[in-house]
Amino acid sequence: MAVPARRTSKTRKRNRRGHIKLTTPGLAPCPNCGELRVSHRVCPSCGYYNGKQVIDVKAN
């Protein structure tokens, strides 16, 4: 089985891992209530998705 001839340096390792990161979720305003919500998901504040009420949200 092959083994590395040289040790991987900190710089090379960190440069390789530079693209491994978390991405921010795609937020968009809800067309019904205007609150920010995750795209392609039901709005947690009003319960609407695609112009229809999907879940019943109790108003506080």
From Swiss-Prot:
Keywords of this entry: Ribonucleoprotein, Ribosomal protein
GO biological process, one term: translation
Cystine connections: none
SUPFAM superfamilies: Zn-binding ribosomal proteins (SSF57829)
GO molecular function: structural constituent of ribosome
InterPro entries reported in the protein's UniProt record: Ribosomal_bL32, Ribosomal_bL32_bact, Ribosomal_zn-bd
PANTHER family assigned: 50S RIBOSOMAL PROTEIN L32, LARGE RIBOSOMAL SUBUNIT PROTEIN BL32
Name this protein carries in UniProt: Large ribosomal subunit protein bL32
